[in-house]
């Protein structure tokens, strides 16, 4: 059985992330923009973004470009890009 991660929001759509044995060979066909939850001032939201980036970095992701106050472009361990905002 392959390991994976599935989100289950209150309503569809669902998202499944699965490990595959093949290495990345081309540009991503899918780019995820992940949004942190919660309310508050722009400073509070940015603090939550940087906290999430720290957690993702600890799990193996790498921050590539930071647009302070807005979003961070990251890559997973296989080089696939995604953004955290």
Which sequence ranges carry the predicted segments?
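Short, conserved charged micro-motifs
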Residues: 40-48
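Short hydrophobic/aromatic beta-strand micro-patches
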Residues: 33-35
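Short Gly/Pro-enriched loop/turn and capping motifs at secondary-structure junctions
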Residues: 22-23, 37-39
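Hydrophobic alpha-helical positions that pack around
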Residues: 28
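Vicinal oxygen chelate
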Residues: 1-24, 50-85
């Amino acid at each position: 059985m392959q390991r994976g991660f599935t989100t289950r929001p209150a309503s569809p759509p669902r998202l499944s992330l699965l490990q595959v044995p093949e290495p990345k060979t081309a540009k991503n066909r899918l780019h995820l923009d992940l949004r942190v939850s919660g309310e508050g001032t722009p400073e509070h939201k940015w603090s939550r973004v940087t906290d999430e980036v720290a957690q993702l970095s600890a799990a193996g992701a790498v921050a590539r470009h930071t647009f302070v106050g807005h979003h961070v472009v990251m890559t997973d361990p296989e080089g696939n890009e995604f953004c955290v905002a």
